[in-house]
Amino acid sequence: MKSSVIVLGSVLLALVCFSGAAARTADDVIEDIIEYHGCYDREADEKVDELLTELTDMDERRGALWRDIMDYWDYVNSDLPVHENRLPNGLPDDDSLCIVVLGFELNDDGSMKEELIGRLQVALACARQYPNACVLCTGGGTAADAPEITEGRSMGDWMLAHGLSPHRLIVEDRSLTTAENAMNSYRILFSDYPSVESVAIVSSSYHIPWGSLLFEAGLMTSASERGTRRINVISNAAYPTTNDTYREDELLRWQTGGMLQMIGRNEKALEYYFDYENVKKPVL
């Protein structure tokens, strides 16, 4: 009897261990991929590759998707050309192009900060360069004392006041982060603007790699999961500026928070955004 109990206990323990191992999901692996790269950058390439292989074994479609996303993440932080003040020549000159202007936190009273106006000035120049492109202004309510005022609507009003034709304007005014900008913008473009095949990002110079990453990753993920048409980030135009809150040596941290938010790991994303010193980093 005693030996039978021991055997039964061993079997139950093995089942518990197996159950715990089986509980690891594809989303868990993707979270690890993001965190390893976000914490260690290229030093974690070997570990990230192992995780991508693990993900592919679990889900071939998502494995291929995330390999492409990680290649793009490396690209934006090393080789992405950032074009100041205007878009490059040679982009599509028809309505397949959408110029996406990323919002920036409003003043407490709802007025726009100088940095946001700078982005809009660049966007207006881009709209004149490509007169057949639509212009999407994206950003939600970030004014502490005027929550009814949104970045997207304020930006759109500014563009109209400075000569943009109303039929070219698209407003997305529910997003509070760059990750939400990307996801909400795709929904609008996919459902209401079937001619759009590519986007050009307009933002501050330090934010272009970050914004391009989250938009391309968000667009890729949305199209892959829905089995719908792909929209690509093909270029950018930057308002040249710096920002003490978003220092160059910390941009990987903010990118990581955005990527985690994009996959629905909001609590972990908030740690990277606002409590980075206490983030429990994975061991390399």
Where are the predicted features?
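A non-catalytic structural micro-motif
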Residues: 134-136, 156-174, 220-240
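Bacterial N-terminal signal peptides
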Residues: 9-16
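Short, solvent-exposed amphipathic alpha-helices that sit
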Residues: 119-123, 147-159, 210-221
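Histidine-anchored nucleotide/phosphate-binding helix
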Residues: 113-131
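Surface-exposed cleft-lining segments at the edges of enzyme active sites
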Residues: 105-112, 144, 171
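Bacterial N-terminal signal peptides that target proteins for export
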Residues: 1-8
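N-terminal nucleotide-binding beta1-loop-alpha1 segment
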Residues: 97-105
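Extended hydrophobic blocks
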Residues: 20-98, 183-284
